[in-house]
């Protein structure tokens, strides 16, 4: 600046010159700027003052280089008023705008033409911010830029989903709202999406009322035969060291699958595809996802027990038999073991979980609360494995996204923690899912406790406020040097703020997320202790309601599943099925479905057999939601010889009533 200028001329020139300094060093992807120091009473506008994270522009002959401020310092501060001092800004070079023949610009990530020493630096203008952060790719808006709230923060959908993403932040920083906001923005522009969200706290149903298919233990159908061998061993045995029991299952399950296939195909069992003996285990493996009956498994176990001479060898057989009988009578496992009939409904199960067809419900919210704690990891493992296999065998024609909330539960960093098959299933999606159209979203409050292999595969990260040093270090390791300066903000980020970096956004950026509508918020708000503790509105009646809901929850699950089981075993044509009992072929060579507790006794005389039937009896007390609860009691009743059933006069109305009750619950 010319020293002969008057003070007024200096101020006028400073105010008209958009530059804020000049390049004095360039090293790889970094540069250092010597900032112009306002003197003689001159002051820059607030918008022209560089801050941490501010996007700056550097004009070259053919491009405009874009850089992010990563550090600010005054290495030589003034000792007295009026003395000169040196202001330094450290930059990370992140992209460039190429000048086109039509005087327009094209944004490219990365830098091909580096700034030269002495090049002037200025704060990026609105048009440059729009070119850099909005772009032309298929994008959705999730908020605004911290640097300029008039510029929308855009997320590129294909890059976000195709290469996996993570949402990280301390408890209470808005992870659930951020997850809901991003997914809602995607669904709004992509109504034929296929998203499966694992919801361990039952909080997302309210966030996707118009788009979500809610699956809970009350209406879930995940038959046991969909489990692979590791998963069924976890359910029935639970200890991988019990080798004898594992070997028994490994031998008998393929045979049980063969028995079901033979009975289902009847005369087709002699075709070329099923020419071998039904007891030939080589036709099926323990992992083949085909139906089989627990009754067949129990029969074979009992047969083996009868052939053993040494009573000491009975122990593993008894353990499996006891567990099978116990679990099939446990209402909590009804979604897996409760069906009175076994049928091959795999296509229908896949359709409901992965929304094929979409039917205006592009997201499935699978609520895990209410599942037995010991089986949650198994259910998650099955769903994650099915997600990958669905994508593989669908040849990528229907891309699907798996959202894993509280992911540190399922893919912990410790090799000794977690359920191995579950970790392997999620890792497989993370490593190989991109090639087949299976994407992964990881949501967690403890990045340091996540398997680093999984987190390293997430090419886009939304980092909300974090104060833990270990968590910050994990995030830091995932960021390139050019955006590392932004992470200094992590402990000081406000509500609804995040640092976003990776392939899903054009450049590392600090985002202020949009507000969600009040009726679309997840049920994840923090309890107001101070408000609740100022009034006394809890009494003995309140405790009674808690106890009633606590106890009724299991009964309602049992009732809902039992109604479904009854519907499965009844033909809605006015009469019960008159097909032969399971174990005896009908005229067409098929086996009729029969409750599993009868199948194991099919060889006994009918008049000597007792079975457990569900008989409804209305209890006097109301349920947790205020309506009458019909509890279904198991009672021992004799089984009459099979005979042709004549339709009763009122059978049709009774069955219609049952159908109506089922439809109301669904």
PLM features: what roles do these ranges have?
Residues 233, 238, 427-432, 436-514:
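Conserved ATP-driven motor cores of ASCE-family P-loop NTPases powering translocation/secretion/packaging/pilus
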Residues 185-189, 386-392, 423-440, 484:
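Substrate-engagement module of ASCE P-loop NTPases
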Residues 192-195, 361-363, 397-401, 436-441:
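Loop/turn-to-beta-strand initiation segments
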Residues 139-222, 500, 530-536, 540-543, ...:
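Glycine-rich phosphate-binding loop of nucleotide-binding enzymes
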Residues 165, 366, 441:
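Conserved beta-strand position immediately N-terminal to the Walker
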Residues 1-168, 395-398, 413:
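Basic- and hydrophobic-enriched, low-structure N-terminal and domain-boundary segments
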